[in-house]
UniProtKB/Swiss-Prot annotation:
The record marks R105 as: Important to generate the dianion. The gene is mtnD. This is Acireductone dioxygenase. It comes from Serratia proteamaculans (strain 568). Signal peptide: none annotated. Pathway: Amino-acid biosynthesis; L-methionine biosynthesis via salvage pathway; L-methionine from S-methyl-5-thio-alpha-D-ribose 1-phosphate: step 5/6. Binds 1 Fe(2+) cation per monomer. The keyword Magnesium does not apply.
């Protein structure tokens, strides 16, 4: 089940607010300009889904985002516990960073933890199957896929080159709870 935990960026041990209610999560995140919605990820994709199959299964959802925001491209990221690069990929995005464009993800399988650093607070969003999240460009954040990642998400871009991570050098992520 999706979740949101809000902390002060000075108190990583004491949550200020928590919820597993999708509507409450969406309302809290809307206040900081983050889009969070529950969509239907109801297609059977199999054990190791081919990206083309995932795209074809959810093209109608992609088309909706393109029509709304004018996004230019999309792809699929799929991580499994047996991925030889899982530790390298996990550690890469566990450091606080920004992107020059929105970070849009639609989780069609599994889960991941987005952590946003805004307005003196840390917003930890547990995204699971059916969750759409859009993190605004230049938002300081990190992402935890867990030690045994198991998710498939559609990524939507204005421009794939704009999705380069710009690391802040702040080690704040080390102080906050991880996915596992």
């Amino acid at each position: 089940m999706s979740g949101l935990t809000i902390f002060s960026d000075q108190e990583p041990q004491q949550p200020l607010w928590q919820s597993r209610d999708a509507q409450a999560i969406g309302q809290q995140l809307a206040q900081i300009g983050v889009r969070f919605e529950r969509w239907q990820a109801d297609r059977e994709l199999g054990e190791n889904p081919d990206p083309a199959v995932v795209i074809a299964a959810y093209q109608h959802q992609i088309d909706r985002l393109v029509a709304e925001k004018g996004y230019q491209s999309w792809d699929v990221i799929s991580m499994r516990p047996d991925n030889a690069q899982r530790e390298v990929l996990r550690s890469k995005f566990l450091s606080e960073h920004t992107h020059g464009e929105d970070e849009v993800r639609f989780f069609v399988e599994g889960a991941g933890l987005f952590c946003l650093h805004l307005d003196g607070k840390i917003f930890q969003i547990l995204c699971e199957k059916n969750d759409l999240i859009s993190v605004p460009a230049n938002t300081r954040h990190w992402f935890d896929m867990g030690s045994a990642p198991n998710f498939t998400a559609i990524r939507v871009f204005d421009n794939p080159e704009g999705w380069v991570a710009h690391f802040t050098g702040d080690n704040i992520a080390d102080a906050y709870p991880r996915l596992d």
